[in-house]
Amino acid sequence: MTLESMMACCLSDEVKESKRINAEIEKQLRRDKRDARRELKLLLLGTGESGKSTFIKQMRIIHGAGYSEEDKRGFTKLVYQNIFTAMQAMVRAMETLKILYKYEQNKANALLIREVDVEKVTTFEHQYVNAIKTLWSDPGVQECYDRRREFQLSDSAKYYLTDVDRIATVGYLPTQQDVLRVRVPTTGIIEYPFDLENIIFRMVDVGGQRSERRKWIHCFENVTSIMFLVALSEYDQVLVESDNENRMEESKALFRTIITYPWFQNSSVILFLNKKDLLEDKILHSHLVDYFPEFDGPQRDAQAAREFILKMFVDLNPDSDKIIYSHFTCATDTENIRFVFAAVKDTILQLNLKEYNLV
């Protein structure tokens, strides 16, 4: 064999090896691209306290590992803090709304609760348990609770305050429902990925309060679906940040902004009209027409109220070709969310069949 032919032979081996490596790289790139496409990014949006964090907790219960005993124990302190926060809010409101205590000893109880530094609460001591129970049973405090739309009070207040005896027992372990009801304002961005039918659903929850929204911007890339939560029960409430602005008007303004963002042109929009259970209770004594004069349906009718609210949001969509998928939900009800998310998952997969190699 001549030197030239040997060199040609070596060269062709090198070329072959180089081609093989290139082919491997191309193959890996295609695989990476396909795998990236098999991840769906779901962005949870909505104003503060619309139920986004509760929705993520439900995904962990329904499609993830749920909450172990140790996980639940980690919520104990937060449950106690939620109880103190709720009673402090009512004690302050009693003063603002000039409501009198029926039982004289509750003035001292109110003072005792007021002086607690909630962030330092880690236990639920006997004297505080008694003070909170006595306050909650006071007709004055009950009147204050009935006027809760006039001040800021967590939706979970009644749930916890009517169950103080159970929560105050030695060795108390929060139930799944206790965990779902805990209110902790979301600061920053929380991601929860879960695997369904070989596809990763990456749910991203961003803080709903105004100060948190500027952090959203970098979440806007490659969003498969926008899941926008509206609290149906907020039609008569004002904002945490501004007490002369209606919460539902703020929610409408945010929804209008979101659906017209160019980033979301190709993202499907799913509207969750949440807290339907609270609406059913509230509509009996707080009339929708007092806050939205254009409502001409019957009073005390939850169905008419929610259909009106749905239409208000759907009418904000400027693009007649874009479908807005909607569901009425109760984020604290695991079975309701299981049922609704099964439908949502089917919708999302149907819309992404070709792109995700599902056909």
UniProtKB/Swiss-Prot annotation:
<feature type="binding site">
    <location>
        <position position="186"/>
    </location>
    <ligand>
        <name>Mg(2+)</name>
    </ligand>
</feature>
<dbReference type="GO" id="GO:1990806">
    <property type="term" value="P:ligand-gated ion channel signaling pathway"/>
</dbReference>
<keyword id="KW-0378">Hydrolase</keyword>
<dbReference type="InterPro" id="IPR000654">
    <property type="entry name" value="Gprotein_alpha_Q"/>
</dbReference>
<comment type="similarity">
    <text>Belongs to the G-alpha family. G(q) subfamily.</text>
</comment>
<keyword id="KW-0547">Nucleotide-binding</keyword>
<keyword id="KW-0479">Metal-binding</keyword>
<feature type="binding site">
    <location>
        <begin position="180"/>
        <end position="183"/>
    </location>
    <ligand>
        <name>GTP</name>
    </ligand>
</feature>
<dbReference type="GO" id="GO:1904888">
    <property type="term" value="P:cranial skeletal system development"/>
</dbReference>
<feature type="lipid moiety-binding region" description="S-palmitoyl cysteine">
    <location>
        <position position="9"/>
    </location>
</feature>
<dbReference type="GO" id="GO:0005525">
    <property type="term" value="F:GTP binding"/>
</dbReference>
<feature type="region of interest" description="G4 motif">
    <location>
        <begin position="270"/>
        <end position="277"/>
    </location>
</feature>
<dbReference type="GO" id="GO:0007207">
    <property type="term" value="P:phospholipase C-activating G protein-coupled acetylcholine receptor signaling pathway"/>
</dbReference>
<dbReference type="InterPro" id="IPR001019">
    <property type="entry name" value="Gprotein_alpha_su"/>
</dbReference>
<dbReference type="GO" id="GO:0001664">
    <property type="term" value="F:G protein-coupled receptor binding"/>
</dbReference>
<feature type="region of interest" description="G5 motif">
    <location>
        <begin position="329"/>
        <end position="334"/>
    </location>
</feature>
<dbReference type="GO" id="GO:0007200">
    <property type="term" value="P:phospholipase C-activating G protein-coupled receptor signaling pathway"/>
</dbReference>
<feature type="binding site">
    <location>
        <begin position="46"/>
        <end position="53"/>
    </location>
    <ligand>
        <name>GTP</name>
    </ligand>
</feature>
<dbReference type="GO" id="GO:0005834">
    <property type="term" value="C:heterotrimeric G-protein complex"/>
</dbReference>
<keyword id="KW-0449">Lipoprotein</keyword>
<feature type="region of interest" description="G2 motif">
    <location>
        <begin position="178"/>
        <end position="186"/>
    </location>
</feature>
<keyword id="KW-1003">Cell membrane</keyword>
<keyword id="KW-0472">Membrane</keyword>
<keyword id="KW-0807">Transducer</keyword>
<protein>
    <recommendedName>
        <fullName>Guanine nucleotide-binding protein subunit alpha-11</fullName>
    </recommendedName>
</protein>
<dbReference type="GO" id="GO:0045634">
    <property type="term" value="P:regulation of melanocyte differentiation"/>
</dbReference>
<dbReference type="GO" id="GO:0086100">
    <property type="term" value="P:endothelin receptor signaling pathway"/>
</dbReference>
<feature type="binding site">
    <location>
        <begin position="274"/>
        <end position="277"/>
    </location>
    <ligand>
        <name>GTP</name>
    </ligand>
</feature>
<dbReference type="GO" id="GO:0071467">
    <property type="term" value="P:cellular response to pH"/>
</dbReference>
<dbReference type="GO" id="GO:0007186">
    <property type="term" value="P:G protein-coupled receptor signaling pathway"/>
</dbReference>
<dbReference type="GO" id="GO:0008217">
    <property type="term" value="P:regulation of blood pressure"/>
</dbReference>
<dbReference type="GO" id="GO:0047391">
    <property type="term" value="F:alkylglycerophosphoethanolamine phosphodiesterase activity"/>
</dbReference>
<feature type="region of interest" description="G1 motif">
    <location>
        <begin position="41"/>
        <end position="54"/>
    </location>
</feature>
<dbReference type="GO" id="GO:0007507">
    <property type="term" value="P:heart development"/>
</dbReference>
<keyword id="KW-0342">GTP-binding</keyword>
<dbReference type="GO" id="GO:0005886">
    <property type="term" value="C:plasma membrane"/>
</dbReference>
<feature type="region of interest" description="G3 motif">
    <location>
        <begin position="201"/>
        <end position="210"/>
    </location>
</feature>
<dbReference type="GO" id="GO:0031683">
    <property type="term" value="F:G-protein beta/gamma-subunit complex binding"/>
</dbReference>
<dbReference type="InterPro" id="IPR027417">
    <property type="entry name" value="P-loop_NTPase"/>
</dbReference>
<dbReference type="GO" id="GO:0032024">
    <property type="term" value="P:positive regulation of insulin secretion"/>
</dbReference>
<dbReference type="InterPro" id="IPR011025">
    <property type="entry name" value="GproteinA_insert"/>
</dbReference>
<dbReference type="GO" id="GO:0045202">
    <property type="term" value="C:synapse"/>
</dbReference>
